[in-house]
Amino acid sequence: MMNMLSDRKKLILKAVVENYSQKGQPVGSKLLTHLPYLKFASATIRYDMVQLEKEGFLQKNHTSSGRVPSFKGYTYYLNHLLTRDHDVACMFESIDKVIQKKRFCKGQVIKEALSLLNNLTNYTAMAIGSDIFNNSKINKIDFIPLNSTQAVILIITDKGNVQHQNISLDQTKEISIYDLKDVVQVVNDLLTDKFLSEAANIIQSDFFKQTIAKYICFQEQLIALFMEVFSSFASENLYFSGVSKMLEKPELSNPEIIKKFMGLLERKELLKIMLNQDSLSFKFSDGLQLTPLKDCMILSIPFDVNPNEKGRIAVVGPSWMKYPKVIPILEYLAVHLSKLND
């Protein structure tokens, strides 16, 4: 079984993970013999490292004789061996100062907290607040003419969130601003009291296209317009800080990889995969098959947006990030973001 390691192997695995996190270099048995809590013969440590490699907890680095943790090794470490660095408590005061800025709206506090998280850890920080897209219903779709060719469409949710989209008509097409008002009324009747996520599916359905078939010359533009509004709702609660620091990494120097990574962030895939987790979660890029990065880790933890909804705050960084420091900062931040409801 995965947790059936001897105490000595546990100490060696913990030492490899934490030394690799601190120095970013493969760890050899000679280095481990100098650690005060590993008072074992060099041959014994070397033998156990070979066994840990055979068991899949460590892997050989091609450029040196040292070893680095594997996905399995990191997983075991995070589940069984992690001890939190109590020295990070000196950083909590700066978190308290951000959280106590009650004059800001909650969204602004989250943004400031993410910026601080990025500064404290040096990793990209992300958060999803209230899941407006999946938890809000359309209350009303309104149409406001501006002139004979321009108008504004408003979508208002039952939670009071509002998005608008400007629309311009091509005068060469056989549809007037008054025709458009009629079709928006049809859409309003069809989508009122539907969840935003449900409405997005309806808009793209054959049924919807048949419903507005009379306005075929404007059909594609209308569908694109509503999808743009729904996309705005979906991204309204998404926050980032320190993305540029990830883009400075050598493995992201390829423009095509940068494009994929940014698209990944915009689609919120990195956080969506963990929204159903109730506690601290970790995911490796190798196991996700989502990110263009190799050896990437995503650490996330939930916080209470309100008594009925949870958000998620996370850091994205290399798999060798300093877990004893990063995890207690994440945990403290999540607890205190939840207290914004008090």
From Swiss-Prot:
One of its GO terms (molecular function) is DNA binding. Pfam families: HrcA. Keywords: Repressor, Stress response, Transcription, Transcription regulation. GO terms for biological process: negative regulation of DNA-templated transcription. Belongs to the HrcA family. PANTHER family: HEAT-INDUCIBLE TRANSCRIPTION REPRESSOR HRCA. Negative regulator of class I heat shock genes (grpE-dnaK-dnaJ and groELS operons). Prevents heat-shock induction of these operons. NCBIfam families: hrcA. This is Heat-inducible transcription repressor HrcA.
